[in-house]
Amino acid sequence: MTTEPLALDFKSATLYAIRVVLHSADPDQLAEALGRRMADAGSFFENEAVVIDASRVSAPIDWPALVKALGAHKLPVIGVVAENGNLERARAAGLIPVELSAPRTQQSVDPAPPNHVSTPVPAAPEASRAAQEQLRSAMKGDAQAVPTRAARDTTEAASHTPAAPQSSTALVITKPLRSGQRVYARHTDLVVIGMVSQGAEVIADGNIHVYGPLRGKAMAGARGDTSARIFTTHLDAELLAVAGVYRVVEDRLDRNLHNQPALVRLNGDTLHIEALKS
């Protein structure tokens, strides 16, 4: 019996992938929508693995053309979700069927209107009040104010099922993130103590807390948790996203939000940004 190691081995792995949901089979409409989405998001989704979800489309899909269009935007396709004839055509095109075991509760990926900012909610839920207290403590220099897990709105928790199990311990980053750096907190919250520079990306399956200037891109609820939120002591982000609903911040935010403590959350299909007053 040989003791030499084998040339390969099998290890478990969990892949992060973007779910591209099709609402049409028309190649021209898909190409136009893809171009607009990528123009809005800049380089945020570039080189991210993609699963094409065609479960809502019954018309025949030109899979090779769609894969080529996604590839032109640096979006490699690793699998598809489809039914009946489209599933067979996907297999014939060399694509791999996959199962999404936990479909997201938030279906819309439409960005919020460019100039839409919600007003502060007078009767904030418990999660918002807890986050406000955490941010106030952080702004006063209380090092023990950093949470290991953010509180969730109990009403939202009852009506929305998270797309993936959440860990009880947050991923804590205690140094600034430079341009080009990316941090992903899988199945948990992300806490950054320091600046997230322009060009840096922070992603979490749960909530995101930035105790410092948030100048890069932030995506909370990456696996579809619509109750996820983004908290920061200084809001100046390039892009904000919760459960796939995103907003590119092209123009400076209102004075009561720019470089101020803020909360970002979903309200239905709309991304809301709220000031957190100290």
Curated annotation (Swiss-Prot):
Superkingdom of this protein's organism: Bacteria
Function description: Cell division inhibitor that blocks the formation of polar Z ring septums. Rapidly oscillates between the poles of the cell to destabilize FtsZ filaments that have formed before they mature into polar Z rings. Prevents FtsZ polymerization.
SUPFAM superfamilies registered for this protein in UniProt: Cell-division inhibitor MinC, C-terminal domain
Protein name: Probable septum site-determining protein MinC
Stretches for region Disordered: 104-167
Keyword Cell division tagged: yes
Entry keyword annotation includes Cell division: yes
GO biological process terms, semicolon-separated: cell morphogenesis; division septum assembly; regulation of cell division; regulation of cell septum assembly
InterPro entries according to UniProt: CAP/MinC_C (IPR016098), MinC (IPR013033), MinC_C_sf (IPR036145), MinC_N (IPR007874), Septum_form_inhib_MinC_C (IPR005526)
HAMAP family per UniProt: MinC
Protein family per UniProt: Belongs to the MinC family.
Gene: minC
Pfam families cross-referenced by the UniProt entry: MinC_C, MinC_N
Subunit structure: Interacts with MinD and FtsZ.
Keywords: Cell cycle, Cell division, Septation
